[in-house]
Amino acid sequence: MLGPMDEFPVHQIPQPIAWPGSSDRNFYDRSYFNAHDRTGDIFLISGIGYYPNLGVKDAFVLVRRGDEQTAVHLSDAVDQDRLNQNVLNYRVEVTDPLHSLRIVMDETEGMAVDLTWNGLFDVVQEQRHILRAGTRVTLDAQRFAQLGSWSGHIAIDGKEIAVDPAVWIGSRDRSWGIRPIGEAEPAGRPADPPFEGMWWLYVPMAFDDFSIVLIIQEDPSGFRSLNDCTRIWKDGRVEQLGWPRVKIHYTSGTRIPTGATIEATAQSGALLRFEVESKLPVPIHVGGGYGGDSDWIHGMWKGDKFTERLTYDMTDPAIIGRAGFGVIDHVGRALCTEGSKPSVEGWGLFEHGALGRHDPSGFTDWLTVAD
């Protein structure tokens, strides 16, 4: 079970790098990327994950253009070489750790990608994220995030899309630890009290002089179990932004947001107000493999050298019905006003999900929608 990493002094416990320190089946190690051109016409989301206790590695590319959302999935048996991240035709080349990398997917199911990332700001280490169901830890993860630009090209069914770093922007994160993956486990005794829902907001955005990474999670009563809100300056300074107040603006009759108003506090005491708008929504549980996806689940064994392509009509009532029951990633635009200073424009990701009951939003159960 030895691999190339075992040549280096990077071990944390007395066993090969390929053996996770935890025997939990849900141990994972994953990268997530998104890219868009600030128009709302296209949004690409991609990721690669290793699940050593399940013997699986997989990757995906998800693209929305207009009313069509297309997913390419790749899955294979895990290997021991963590220095060369790859799943079949998909690979991630880390050219300058924490600063630049390259994603390549050679033609697979009619799609190909060659994108180079350059960080616009330093990475920021997020707070450790822990969730429990009863006495069991169901999520225990560490993550870092970064805002950056993209260059290269995307090809779909023979049509090439040029990716100009002057306009293409996005965010990425690396996370590892424990989270639900693969096939569902037997539930055992029903939870008491039962799981009633979760409210989630994640907003990484890049402005000219700074980036922000806002992460907020609340339980059904509105109690905030995660509040990790920072501003990253060009010189590397990281500034905490206090306890933001958030108002999500939902489309009437749905839980799909059109935007949000976020008020935070700079270290100077000045009010920071972000007016965020959605330019294009991508439900990441529709082909992306995230919670509630009925078509693709991260870490599930699909057999050796598995690939597939799925295409969704986002106007299909069945897909619309699915979209409201998961987390949605949006091409995000924001105007930031700090005190009496002129507003500045930023772009990035606006990710939100309101699942189940959330008293502050007026959602009394799993089916309540916005007025």
PLM feature spans:
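Structured soluble/peripheral alpha/beta segments that form catalytic or ligand/cofactor-binding pockets
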Residues: 1-371
